[in-house]
Amino acid sequence: MAIAYGMLSCHIQDDKVYDPQPHKDEKYRHRNRRSTIEPLLQIYDALFSHYGDLHWWPGENPYEIMVGAILTQNTAWTNVEKAIARLAEDLTPQRIAAMPVETLEERIRPAGFFRQKARYLKAMTAWYARYNYDAEAVRRVPLDALRPEILSVKGIGKETADSILLYAFGLPSFVVDAYTMRHFARYPLKAGRTYAAVQAYCEARLPESAEIYNHFHALIVINGKEHCKKRPICAGCPLEGGCEKRIEE
């Protein structure tokens, strides 16, 4: 489903952004004026116009996405795919829970850090068992309670937790990664330099929509891989017109 600037701007009324599902805290209900929103939406619009509709996250079901979110820590997605392929028909929470940790380590070896990741997968699976491996039961938990709960699981940090919330369960928790930090520092948006600050900046300026967060993060990642690298390739970048890195060169 295509979501471009027009769809995002439809949430702007009388120079304010209205949440489709208002937050309990009044300060999140009537957010920032159009002038503070437009730079972020301009980035989204430029990326969307260039790359189109991207479909993320790769995975067949919520549990597979959760596994992928852990396996992708400190490695390339190609290595994750190799590890997932080695799990094959055993990639279910029931089978991972029953699998000896040594066997699991060997299966996920291509993903790197396989010993610690095997224990992280065991811990995550044990957490999921509390919900009888039922994704709908997880989704019924309020987000402000669910996120700290997931963060308490061994091996799950903020980026992994938000990836699980957003991609596995379809909940509106904006994912901040190295690509996001790099884009926002170079554009720049003055969003801050910490994970929490950047996440709050984005969530305060975008409609509270998992679909929009999903699309935006996917667009940032693909542009980060193609253009906004540590050593950027600015020619052809859809954001080069407003990028400080480009201006400085």
What are the functions of these language-model segments?
Residues 2-4, 22:
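Ala/Thr-enriched low-complexity intrinsically disordered regions
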Residues 20-33:
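Short, contiguous pre-domain boundary segments
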Residues 37-249:
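Catalytic cores of DNA base-excision repair glycosylases
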